Structures are given as C-alpha cells and as structure tokens.
C-alpha cells in the first residue's frame, strides 16, 4: 500500500525515476546513447516546387546560405525561418534521437523524420545541407543544426521539456529499468507483504507494467 501510494502520482513517479537515473547515470546511459540523443535547431523555408524554385524562393534560399556563412544559426533562424513553432525560439526544436524517425515513436518531436535522420549523421555544431520534405501541408526545405550531443548535459538541460523527453527516452531505451527503479524504492521503503499471494500479485503487476523479471 505504501509503495502504491508513493507511485500513484505521475509527478512523484517522475521524481523517483529522475533521482535514480541521476544517481546511476553512468550505469543506465549506454542503451540511450546508442540512440544518438541530441538537441537540434532548424530553419524551414516553404516552397511550391523544390525542383523548380521561383525567383523569390531562389533569392531567399541564397540569402539564408549567405547569412549562415557570417552569422550564428540561431540568428539566421530567427530572421528567416518559416517554422511557426521554432522561429521565435531562435530555431530551437528541442530533443530528438533515432527513435524520433519512427511513426510509432513515443517522441513528441515535431521535426520531420528526414530532418532527424540528417541530424543523427551530424556532430555537435554541424549544419546539414538543404533537406526537402513533402507532407500533406506542402513542400518545405530544411536546414538542421546540432546544438548538443552530450548525454549528461541533455539529461540535465535547463529546459524542462528537453530534460523530461530525455528522462522518458532513457526509460524507454531499457525495458527493465522502470522495474529496477521501482524495486530499488520498494527495498528502501522496506515494503513487507503479509502473504505470498499478495507478493505474487505485486510481482505480476510490476512485470506486466514495467517489464521487470523477478
């Protein structure tokens, strides 16, 4: 009962997960790092036809390329990007990893899959070539910049959104981790079961919910 009460609120559960991962970061990071976690910024430019740019589109594309030679990606994104979600944040699009390219991904990233794929192939501080993305809303050209690849810095990011996405990505990268955390806190709270049947039900619940093996 005490453990259930402790875990009822998602906020407390998140706290519990965060504390455990912070303490055991070097032990749990490998599976997550294999998914190439990073934070990225983007520049988006809408076009009518990527293969036949209009004079206006050609000029804008050229202006962006020239600006990137002299100015920071953030400044250029703020001045030129047509992405309504990120232009006012200096192009910052947040957290992505290799799972962000999957349609069944748990990622909340709004960065198109092709752009994420390009970002995964870049090092920190690098900018991609132009990437063409066609969706139901039309065709756009993107440039993506990798802002951070250090896993510890991403996990401890000042942005709650980024640090929360990193937390859930770590939990998702190892199916048994949530169970290990729960088991660790159960031992700390010194949970006692009055009978074997209750213990069996609890173990079954944990295994089903968190993927742990007793």
Predicted features by range, described:
Residues 56-64:
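Well-ordered, non-membrane alpha-helical segments in soluble/globular domains
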Residues 63-114, 156-157:
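Peptidyl-prolyl cis-trans isomerase
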Residues 1-51, 55, 106-214:
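PPIase-associated folding chaperone regions across multiple families
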